[in-house]
Swiss-Prot record:
Family matches, as InterPro entries: Fe_traffick_prot_YggX, Fe_traffick_prot_YggX_sf
Example of a GO biological process term: cellular response to oxidative stress
Cellular component, GO annotation: cytosol
Pfam entry (one): Iron_traffic
Protein name as it appears in the record: Probable Fe(2+)-trafficking protein
Family according to the record: Belongs to the Fe(2+)-trafficking protein family.
UniProt xrefs under HAMAP family: Fe_traffic_YggX
A GO term for molecular function: iron ion binding
Domain of life: Bacteria
Its job: Could be a mediator in iron transactions between iron acquisition and iron-requiring processes, such as synthesis and/or repair of Fe-S clusters in biosynthetic enzymes.
Database matches in Gene3D superfamilies: Fe(II) trafficking protein YggX
Species per Swiss-Prot/TrEMBL record: Pseudoalteromonas translucida (strain TAC 125)
Keyword set includes Transit peptide: no
UniProt KW keywords: Iron
């Protein structure tokens, strides 16, 4: 049976992550409080940020920036600002 968590991002009970995907205390907080669905949303935003801002994951400053964006998106209900991106019209 799948593990469930109360997802802080989505504010509902949902399927939790299968294992801790991020190291340290932040990773533990993500594992215990973020659903697979919310993590997938973050991965999409993360990819866009890396591409649009030309982030280098070998650069500690870029990793720190991305971590701040991740915490804001997952736990502080902040939207990720991606310059020049316009969502498709429905």
């Amino acid at each position: 049976m799948a593990r469930t968590v109360f997802c802080q991002k989505l504010q509902k009970e949902a399927e939790g992550l299968g294992f801790q995907l991020y190291p340290g205390e932040i990773g533990e907080k993500i594992f215990n409080n973020i659903s697979k669905e919310a993590w997938a949303q973050w991965q999409h935003k993360q990819t866009m940020l890396i591409n649009e801002k030309h982030l280098n994951m070998m650069d500690p400053e870029h990793r720190s920036f991305l971590e701040q964006q991740m915490v804001g998106f997952l736990f502080e209900n902040k939207e990720v600002e991606i310059e020049g991106y316009k969502p498709p019209e429905k």
